[in-house]
Amino acid sequence: MAHEVDLESFKELERDIILRVLYRDQTVQSTEEERVRKLKSHLQHLRWKGAKSSSQEYKEKCCARCQRALGLLLNRGAVCQGCSHRVCSECRVFLRRTRAWKCTVCFEDRNVKIKTGEWFFEERARKFPTAGRRETAGAKLLQSYQRLSKISVVPPTPPPFSESQCSSSSRLQELGHFRGFNKSVENLFLSVTTQMRKLSKSQNDMTSEKHLLAMDPRQCVGHTERRSQSDTAVNVTSRKASTPDILKAFHQEDPKHPPDPVLKQDTPPSSPTHSAVFSGGLRHGSLISINSTCTEMGNFDNANVTGEIEFAIHYCVKSCSLEICIKTCKNLAYGEEKKRKCNPYVKTYLLPDRSSQGKRKTRVQKNTLDPTFEETLKYQVDPGQLMTRRLQVSVWHLGTLARRVFLGEVILPLAMWDFKDSTAQNARWYPLRAKAEKYEENIPQNNGELAVRAKLVLPAGPRKPQEAQEGQLALNGQLCLVVLGAKNLPVRSDGTLNSFVKGCLTLPNQQKLRVKSPVLKKQACPQWKHSFVFNGVSSSQLRQSTLELTVWDQAIFGMNDRLLGEARLGSKGGAAGCPDSGSQSKLQWHRVLSSPNLWTDMTLVLH
């Protein structure tokens, strides 16, 4: 806030300096006003020059600036892009930067705005149209109403109404509170419905290409298929919301186009060494769905599980791919018992990976209890991970409004499967079973691989043990660990992770040295290349120590981080629930300690 300056409170010298500055400022302002006045007068003169007089006669075609006559073929003039007037060639000004031209009036008007600074006020008024306006009482009321509508939607429960405890005025006030609460709830429902419609519309616009390969690989027809992903995402949201109005508004969004749950990308046939089961029919490397977690969260219906499924399993060592040939099903249960309807399809997972990236699906067969698929689903799996994976083959019914019904499943531990046996590649019948509550805990789970490099750094000229005092040698060692990257991690539904690595070295005296890597966001196969350094350790201490490495997915909105997997090295190596990995981790730890000052590359299996 500006204050009035009293010159009498200053000394004479100070007063002279202030007055001198004020006079100079007044002179500068007057000079600037004179300069602006000359620029505007010159612009006005150009406009008057082009004005037509009633006392003179003009031809139909003439220059809008100098009033010269324009010809039919030569000197016809051109239309200015700024004012849309036709001007001759002498009344144009060419702009070098934009490689365009303007008439003299438009150019001078632009020049005046630049030199006087009027362009700044025009741009400010354009970006902030309400700036400088006087606030009215109506605007204040609207702002207060908007603030009230943003208050917490669910207020505390009001006390029970009692006539003896409140007068007529308190009744009216309480009634007003109830009306405000109902209004805020209506606003909440409207905003949630709008957001769900936007989500459904944006996801329905995604498309994927589907290429079909028949028996002859040369006959290939490619076409595009509309892809909808909104069914699963909104099913989860609608099940969580308990308001029927939200569900009604969403189901009315697009009832004519149910989403297609099958998204495939065909792959060429494999080598001729495969059995006839895998060489015939259509071959598919099924694409994953972005939102594939609704059925795994229990958002589905159950039917009486009956019937069998026929499929075959083959593993190609050259391409490191696991192929599941889905043949046919028989005697399935009805997905909708009242309508006597069944639209079955098959979905597979390689457990424990239940992410959308690890899901494969077949086409939907309409109105049949004995569907025939003849499709091959592929997974890229390293041979070392097969022993820790389980194949889950489940049959589902696609109902109206993308509602899923569980028809049965088969779970096969791949550790017990003989891939070298040729008879094991033949198609077999498996009875469908109900969904198990808990899977076997004694089967080790593979949650990916972590690539690291380790080195024990010892002094260049270590002293002899008899010359060194006890405990001094422990301060000379250094353990260096480089976390390179990870792969095959259980990703989120969108196929990404915000992952980081934690390291904990537990010494024999139960002292723990903890380190942490930076977070790599939105990467399914992160590559940290981050170094962990543990100082003040010796080889004798490390032989009795344990190094634990854990991979985490950073959560959002204050939630707890999700553990993706862990691996241990040292005397107590081996992850919990996986005793077979203990001997391998001890062997790798021994290699690091037995070769000091040398890097040792390791690939740790996360459990």
Curated annotation (Swiss-Prot):
Bias type Polar residues, positions: 230-241
Record region (Disordered): 221-279
Any Gene Ontology biological process: intracellular protein transport
GO cellular component, one term: plasma membrane
UniProt KW keywords: Membrane, Repeat
Topology of this chain in the membrane: Peripheral membrane protein
Pfam families hit by this protein: C2, FYVE_2
Disulfide bonds: none
Domain C2: 305-430, 458-590
Physiological role: May act as Rab effector protein and play a role in vesicle trafficking. Binds phospholipids in the presence of calcium ions.
Assembly information from the UniProt record: Monomer. Binds NRXN1. Binds RAB27A that has been activated by GTP-binding via its N-terminus.
Name of protein: Synaptotagmin-like protein 3
Organism: Mus musculus
